[in-house]
Amino acid sequence: MDSSTIISLFIIGSILVGGSILLSAFSSRLGIPILVIFLAIGMLAGIDGLGGIAFDNYPVAYLISNLALAVILLDGGMRTRATAFRVALWPSLSLATVGVIITAGLTGIAAAWLFGLDKIEGMLIGAIVGSTDAAAVFSLLGDKGLNERVTSTLEIESGSNDPMAVFLTITLIAMIQNGQIHLDWLFLVHLIREFGLGVILGLGGGWLLQQVINRITLTNALYPLLAVSGGIMMFALTTALEGSGILAVYLCGFVLGNRPIRNRYGILQTFDGMAWLSQICMFLALGLLVTPSDLWMIAIPALILSLWLMLVARPLSIFVGLLPFRNYTTRERVFLSWVGLRGAVPIILAVFPMMAGLDNAHMYFNVAFFIVLISLLLQGTSLGFAARLAKVVVPPTASPISRVGMDIHPENPWEQFIYQLGEENWCVGAALRDLKMPRHTRIAALFRDNVLLHPTANTRLREGDVLCVIGRERDLPALGRLFSQSPPVALDQRFFGDFILEASANLRDVSSIYGLEFAGEVDGELTLGQFVMALLGGGEPVVGDNVVAEGVVWTIAEKDEQKVSKIGIKIADDPA
């Protein structure tokens, strides 16, 4: 390869990446998922598009995709909070195992019939498209305001269900090559090894990497590079030992994100940019790999298979997988059924048969690509509407426009949050002494018209003021309500009810003050929170959980870390 060819590749690559970034600004205006933009640009630059680039190097695409996926999962794991595991670990694992098997099986049966394939070949297509995609889920869920149970379930499921899909795909390819039609008992042994090594090396490697980062002194810019190189090493090492590298790198990131670590916020900021670059490169490469004209040949059966996957296979897998978990409402189950987002992983898995030289490998790839495209276009674009329809959205709270970690010590949890006030903020005009700041938070600085003020308790806030608040991550919900864009009472009443009460309030006192009548005798020692938790029937509660009893809708309005702190109540026949 001469220098002119290398320069040409640099120019083409920079145009594709830069164009993807610039065009991504239109995705929200058009209501199209940003990942579709990246895929479309790759397809336009490909052999059937305006660019005319002939790219059919499957090993290179596989290399790029795996490297990108490792970075995306490392970043996603680091942003997954431990509270998410408390809320949705076991349901998510059920969906990541039983759910994937059901989805793959039902999809495989339909694929075999639609494309006239052997049952084992149909099952291979089902395995390829059987898992949801972490890149798509992390990208599309960020600003939708879903309740914690739904968000946690989707994030953990997408981060942990790829190993099952990978394992099924590799197993079925080997069976086709060897002429097998039945699984043997070694299937279970290999499955346990995949998950076991993934969990052990992921958690152990994450802990070891955290210890190294905290014990070595480096320039701040090098800590993110050390973290990402360590994560990729865990991915590669686990894969080399025939474990699940995908699960290992996700858990490695989870450990780093939930333990004290030096330069946490520098690492997170760098990871954010690296994850976006990884998504762009991965979807561009996969878009280049496909020949769009070939998709028309399988369009009708592939469309039918896509709809079967979305409307039959995925819903059945959700309802069966969540059968033991009674704390999921029907609305949540229906929403989870619809949001089975497919993304890069099915396309990457579709490369496996190409590299193995199977007879119908090109068809498998085209079908997987078509299903991903339909999933992103239909499910991705309708995600917000479906969430509102299923009523799994909770009232939003204001987020800081910027947050910076105060990395004085790895154990230091303090951060600086920046809030800017607009005319719609309810606290504009209020004196600082009237703000009910969360305990252990302080307003460190107040800027007005780009001038640093020296505020007193009597200083009144104005539109355009910028507040610098010192606090901890757990203070964000309370600060968000304090600086929300509409009066909190009106905002909360629309969702939580007419009255929002302390969960520690005595139930008998509440019934007496508000004129509530109970069919039975009220326990004098029972608090409002205990009463509602008993009605909900167990499980980890989340904000927005509600239950109708005694003619009243009881809704969890606020949680303080793991404890319910406020309950909303309204008459049951009152319109929401």
Curated annotation (Swiss-Prot):
Give the GO cellular component terms, alphabetically: plasma membrane
Main location group: membrane
Q: Name one GO biological process term.
A: cell volume homeostasis
Extract the GO molecular function terms from the UniProt entry: flavin adenine dinucleotide binding; potassium:proton antiporter activity
Mind telling me which Pfam families this protein's record contains?
Answer: CorC_HlyC (PF03471), Na_H_Exchanger (PF00999), TrkA_C (PF02080)
Provide the reaction this enzyme catalyses. Answer: K(+)(in) + H(+)(out) = K(+)(out) + H(+)(in)
**Keywords of this entry:** Antiport, Cell inner membrane, Cell membrane, Ion transport, Membrane, Potassium, Potassium transport, Transmembrane, Transmembrane helix, Transport
Q: Which residues cross the membrane?
A: 6-26, 30-50, 58-78, 95-115, 122-142, 163-183, 185-205, 221-241, 270-290, 293-313, 334-354, 367-387
Stated membrane topology is: Multi-pass membrane protein
- Give residue ranges for domain RCK C-terminal: 404-485
The answer to keyword Ion transport applying to this record is yes
InterPro entries from the UniProt entry? Cation/H_exchanger_TM, FAD-bd_PCMH-like_sf, FAD-bd_PCMH_sub2, Na+/solute_symporter_sf, NhaP2, RCK_C, RCK_C_sf, Transptr-assoc_dom
Localization, per the record, is: Cell inner membrane
Q: Which family does it belong to?
A: Belongs to the monovalent cation:proton antiporter 1 (CPA1) transporter (TC 2.A.36) family. NhaP2 subfamily.
Its job: K(+)/H(+) antiporter that extrudes potassium in exchange for external protons and maintains the internal concentration of potassium under toxic levels.
Its name, as the record gives it, is K(+)/H(+) antiporter NhaP2
Give the gene name: nhaP2
